[in-house]
């Protein structure tokens, strides 16, 4: 089965669901219009299909190699990366003053969905560079911006994020890497970092590492962390490359999936480094990079799910087994069995919902930066903050579920590596873990995003959902009316659960209900956005016989309403159960000796 970039679906989601065209009214994106969007998606899809996708299987089977103290990339990866960088794809949304194209982040994110779908392991390299660009643009000095940003934007150099240490995973307060002043305004880094994605490779001239470390006398815990820039090769004042820095990979991990992406242990042996931002502000500064990465990881969940779905659908159309319950035909296509079609519909509905959630988050990010006035920017900022943990966690959970369902559609053949279905599942499984586990995303949502300011964001969201419900009702379309009823019921349930959690912020009861609440809110967001798509598609119903794709958008939204939104009461019950039996379930009750 040949993977195809979902250009049409992305175009529809951008234009009709998240309404990216409204960004043109801000005046912040000169030259951005419908034609530009279509051209970028078409060209990005072609690059993904023709250059990146053919290397996906080799990346899994061969994988990155560690030889003689350095990482060697999968054959063909370097050439493909150069095609990506030379085409200007690395700088789609970067500022023009640094060599970027200044396009909306939402459009760049759509392109990255196609990149990740074509080759998730390779796509991780430029993905992390995007985060480094964000961090330096926001927190770097003028000199750092001048020296590093043009080459990161062009893709000549790549970037990484160095947080994790053997004793400090999600608990970054425990990190031990030290930064010693060397007397001339720079620093020497000493320590070990693990799980560093694309920490070393042979695809670019230099690698810019953003590293969390502690200065002498820094406060204990997370308040004493600073961010530093340490390049693989030192950079002279004129931008030319100098000698190798005192840092190197000591090994790469053998992983369940994304074999083509080297996951390195990095050793810093008094490596030369520069402070980025203020001392002891490193964790806050790194969150600029992490938030960008979290949204990208959410899109990875969408991307790998889309690829798995396409293969499962192709298999279900070709494979014949048993008698159809609908037509009586024997042998019948797998697609003609109700439960197989149910699985495929659930996959499709969740993919479209997750895609819309991620793109809506990116549009909010664009408006937070470029809104016409302070009030508009603040409203968008609150929405971005509310949506980001949901985009990351809900979409990657969906990615794992969908790749598992895709394997199930294949039956026993899905469990055989040769079909490729297993790779999708293995690759998808990391996404709920890295860039902040999904449990941490849920805690962030409940602990930080339901406060006084962000409580406003939830109310604003529910008001928008309510407006969509009214449009569905006024359509006088029975299918849209049915969606409205499910959406209204789910909205009421979410409001009740939100009120319950808000009254218990900071309590263990709220933390115990965090993960089901994120699922509940994500389901509502997905159902709302699909309903917006259904409203847009309804305008084309006269053409549905000629092009059933439009009717399909309504069918997907209706299926989501009946099969996902309908679960709201049960999920809400789990949210509001609080600690319950958890407090009485100690190690012994769990079977520990």
Model regions and ranges:
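Acidic, low-complexity proline/glycine-rich segments
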Residues: 1-24, 267-269, 274-279, 311, ...
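Amphipathic, small/basic residue-rich leader segments at the start of a protein or domain
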Residues: 1-123, 147, 573-593
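Alpha-helix capping/hinge segments and adjacent helical runs
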Residues: 4-5, 188, 258, 382-462, ...
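Glycine-rich cofactor-pocket loops
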Residues: 28-31, 61-74, 285-296, 310-348, ...
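Internal maturation/activation junctions in enzymes
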Residues: 128-129, 140-181, 362-381, 388, ...
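A short core secondary-structure module
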Residues: 186, 190-244
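A glycine-rich, basic-preceded beta-loop-alpha segment at the flavin cofactor/substrate interface
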Residues: 195-197, 233-250, 255, 262-293, ...
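C-terminal amphipathic alpha-helical interaction region
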Residues: 452, 468-593
